[in-house]
């Protein structure tokens, strides 16, 4: 049998963002890296370029660990410090670095982490102190989606997130999750 291969390329889609989830924790596991250590940034860049080479223009950006993976391996870009009861400070440096690297690799749009758990939006997602390296959650996993604790967090996070998106020119190039499978 003979196989004939033709040199044909389909033009990238225009006006329809393309995204398949991109799991940083898989890269961390494969290369045995700590979340967002210097070696991570070198390893992740070729994967980002490969996404673009295969027609993807949007990347899932784990400002928090994706809720589906919250118990597997924390890999949140946002650094969070508890400054008091229901009070937090946020470090955006790694989020910015990730966005800048993805942009340099050809990514145009950004899909952001869910704000609530899947299967009915019943709970706050698992968000970690620091970047999750020690596995300390900011609240118990059963914390309600509308609890005072999570409302206090969102009241601090969302304005800072919006300011970050505005500052970086990302708001019009962003997609936001509330929850997956909301009716379970």
Predicted regions and their residues:
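Aromatic-lined carbohydrate-binding surfaces of glycoside hydrolases
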Residues: 1-184
